[in-house]
């Protein structure tokens, strides 16, 4: 099994963790934006089937 030779520095670990967190933040922001556009009816990327409840 592969074992790292040296310990990763705290700063490098923090940088990698922040990059990982930033990816999640942008994914959540994009999902929220898409949800907003779908709810207001401004989405142009795809079609949503409208259901008639009455």
Curated annotation (Swiss-Prot):
Keyword line: Chloroplast, Plastid, Ribonucleoprotein, Ribosomal protein
Primary site of residence: plastid
Molecular-function annotations in GO: structural constituent of ribosome
Lineage top rank: taxon: Eukaryota
GO biological process: translation
InterPro entries reported in the protein's UniProt record: Ribosomal_bL32, Ribosomal_bL32_plant/cyanobact, Ribosomal_zn-bd
Coiled-coil parts of chain: none
Localization (cell): Plastid, Chloroplast
Cellular component per GO, a single term: large ribosomal subunit
One matching Pfam family: Ribosomal_L32p
Keyword set includes Chloroplast: yes
UniProt family annotation: Belongs to the bacterial ribosomal protein bL32 family.
Name listed for the protein in its UniProt record: Large ribosomal subunit protein bL32c
Species of the source: Panax ginseng (Korean ginseng)
Lineage: Eukaryota, Viridiplantae, Streptophyta, Embryophyta, Tracheophyta
């Amino acid at each position: 099994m592969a074992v790292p030779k040296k310990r990763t520095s705290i700063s490098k670990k923090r940088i990698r963790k922040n990059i990982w967190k930033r990816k999640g933040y942008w994914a959540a922001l994009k999902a929220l934006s898409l949800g907003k556009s779908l709810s207001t009816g401004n989405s142009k990327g795809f079609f949503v089937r409208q259901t008639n409840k009455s």
